[in-house]
Regions:
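C-terminal luminal/periplasmic domains and tails of membrane-associated envelope-modifying transferases
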Residues: 1, 413-663
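Short helix- or helix-capping micro-motifs
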Residues: 11-15, 126-131, 138, 158, ...
Length: 663
């Protein structure tokens, strides 16, 4: 008993710690656009007794909003007692995530207790794989539906197996109904559980005939179906009671609630993703029948793969003692879920998460049998299973908190996966924000980005969508991989990507984002190039009787490698220099041109003081750059050169300037 309690505590702590540490990391698009607001509105509706207002989405997401509301209540309690300061957007998100995270840890622990009764030798490893699979951990840290649906579906399935294996049957039947009801309140695909549980009851109702013939087999099928029907109807009735009890909208406006529920399934789930998908290197609204097989292969770890690959071998080896009914129920559920998801046009890899814990249970069975076989061959390998599990733990530590970036390294990991699957849900925006915030000129304009609300909490300046390129006073633009894969706004991105990216945000081999600086504004287009990498887009000019101010708009296309000075000279009609200045072209903000990066856009006003006695007339303005150590000018390779007899070699002619001296 003491050992069992310790194991339950271990499973709970592992599941909790992997999901609770560092919850204020980044926002996913669905959280920031949907679930934060839905949770706040749901909580307010419950508090005010406005039951009809608990219809916030057709998913319906009721269990998720209940759990996130728990986190919201904990946050408000901590604020009221003065335990915390008012949290920012990310801190608020972390509190809302806390409720679902606690639920995951508790539900996985319940799963372990059920597995102890079904397969005591494999229960601990199965529960730990359930707790430690990167795919489940990644989604279990979010305010989102699929990981929660996975827990409820798996527990309902395990409980129905126990209903046919261990008394009291009514208790396990009721427990399975409870979890199925919670699954139905979470997301529409839980309807798959209704035929799944029915078929499981048929498979478990009676022992199969020892010798399978057509008469004996058909008799067994008929008797199993007839025996399962009464229990199934009771089970279904209890599940529906749970649904009605926990969704207040069904108490007052059941027609509206159910209408939204089925409209979501038919209207949203029954069509290809409106924002597009990406698979095997091309944008495709419906990725086709191989999508889940290939994407799941990449989401599994090598250890999980090993366990699954061992299953056929040890099933054959133990064919005389293998628990075929339970194997049929578990394996059949996985295959059935994959089949239904594959048959629909809308596909995301997370849609098969409800089958993932069952896959982990099967993988644990395979791993334990493999370890037992290895121990027979080499007794020194008795610690193989713990070592493999420890390796999985090291993998999780390495990927924290970017578990969504995990792809099987044996298949090329993220470096290969980024060219095969749609990648980017908001992860990496924290690093984008950190890099941009560190730039000296970050406050000189707005930032453009896909998924702007996922980036905004990390920046001190406004973030707008890429579509605002022509109307926003934008300084930087973020090109996010997901948008390129979906071929969103191709014209805007083509213009942004015409430049050179300042940096690439790479996480675990995946290039998530490229940061570009947008061209600085100028009034006079004047293309020119100095050396091999410093390009002038144009310039702006203003003047007073005392001063000319020239603002060149530079585009750094290659590193310069030296600290240059800029000269700005003014000549009269006789070719005599009447004013000039030699300064650093980047001013105080970017004084050393050797530090200028490829892709950087720089526009610093250069003041040129005019002599007080300068007469009215037309003057020639020239500009160039030189190395102050050698005095050598940077070659002018593009642009109209000034008269070398007047201005010297490699001086750019900026045109004639009319100056009126009113004194």
């Amino acid at each position: 008993m003491q050992r069992s309690r310790a194991q339950v505590a271990l499973v709970f702590l592992v599941a909790l710690l992997l999901r609770v540490i560092g919850l204020a990391d980044f926002l996913t698009a669905d959280e920031v656009h949907h679930w934060i607001t839905r949770t706040e509105r749901f909580s307010a509706a419950i508090s005010g007794g406005r039951w009809a207002e608990t219809i916030l989405t057709g998913h319906p997401g009721v269990t998720l909003m209940w759990l996130a509301s728990l986190g919201l209540h904990l946050e408000r309690t901590a604020l009221a007692w003065g335990w915390i300061m008012a949290p920012d957007r990310l801190g608020h998100l972390a509190w809302l995530r806390l409720g679902p995270v606690l639920a995951h840890a508790l539900l996985i622990s319940v799963g372990f207790l059920l597995l102890q009764r079904l397969m005591p030798r494999h229960a601990l490893l199965a529960a730990l794989l359930w707790a430690c699979s990167p795919f489940l951990v990644a989604h279990g840290r979010l305010i989102h539906l699929d990981a929660l649906l996975a827990d409820f579906c798996t527990l309902s399935l395990l409980a129905i197996i126990l209903a046919y294996r261990e008394p009291p049957q009514r208790f396990w039947l009721a427990l399975s109904s409870l979890f199925c009801g919670l699954a139905l309140l979470t997301k529409g695909p839980a309807l798959i559980m209704l035929p799944s549980i029915g078929l499981s009851m048929v498979a478990l109702a009676l022992p199969p005939p020892p010798t399978w013939t057509w008469p004996s087999g058909s008799t067994w099928v008929v008797r199993s179906i007839m025996g399962a029907i009464p229990r199934y109807l009771v089970w279904l009735g209890m599940a529906l009671v749970v649904v009605v009890a926990l969704w207040p909208a069904l108490w007052v406006v059941p027609d509206q609630a159910l209408g939204r529920y089925f409209s979501e399934i038919i209207g949203n789930g029954g069509r290809a993703n409106g924002d597009g998908q990406f698979f095997l290197g091309r944008s495709d609204a419906d990725p086709g029948p191989l999508f889940y097989l290939i994407s799941s292969a990449y989401r599994l770890t090598p250890i999980e793969w090993l366990g699954l690959l061992c299953i056929p071998l040890f099933m054959w080896h133990q064919r005389g003692t293998f628990d075929w009914p339970m194997g049929l129920v578990l394996g059949g559920f996985v295959l059935f879920w994959f089949f239904i998801m594959t048959s629909g046009p809308k596909k995301f890899d997370r849609y098969v998460l409800p089958a993932w814990p069952t896959l982990m249970i099967l993988a644990a069975w395979g791993l334990n049998n493999f370890s037992a076989w290895m121990r027979q061959q080499r007794p020194a390998l008795r610690w193989l299973s713990p070592v493999l599990l420890a390796f999985q733990g090291v993998t999780l530590a390495w990927y924290h908190p970017y578990y969504l970036s995990y792809y099987n390294p044996l298949l090329g990991g993220g470096q290969v996966a980024q060219h095969m699957f749609l990648i980017g849900w908001g992860e990496g925006m924290d690093r984008v924000g950190a890099w941009l915030t560190a730039q000296r000129d970050i406050n000189e304009g707005q930032v453009l980005s896909a998924l702007p609300h996922t980036l905004q909490p990390f920046l001190p300046v406004p973030v707008q969508a890429v579509e605002a390129l022509d109307r926003a006073n934008a300084n930087y633009a973020v090109v996010y991989r997901e948008s390129l894969q979906r071929e969103a706004n191709p014209d805007y991105y083509a213009r942004i990507q015409a430049g050179t990216p300042l940096t690439t945000i790479t996480i675990h081999g995946i290039d998530y984002a490229w940061i570009y600086q947008l061209p600085k504004a100028y009034t006079t287009p004047w293309p020119a190039q100095f050396g091999s990498g410093l390009y002038l887009r144009g310039y702006s000019l203003s003047h007073t009787p005392q001063q000319l101010t020239v603002t060149p708009a530079w585009d750094v296309r290659r590193p310069i490698g030296a600290d240059l000075l800029l000269f700005l000279h003014l000549y009269d009609s006789t070719g005599t220099r009447v004013a000039g200045v030699d300064v650093t072209p980047g001013g105080d903000a970017f004084p050393q041109t050797s530090d200028w990066r490829s892709g950087q856009q720089i526009a610093v006003p250069i003041p040129l003081v005019l002599p007080a006695d300068l007469s009215t007339g037309t003057y020639t303005l020239v500009m160039g750059l030189y190395d102050p150590r050698s005095g050598e000018r940077l070659p002018l390779s593009i642009g109209e050169a000034a008269n070398p007899g007047m201005a010297g070699a490699n001086a750019l002619w900026l045109g004639g300037i009319e100056i009126a001296n009113d004194s």
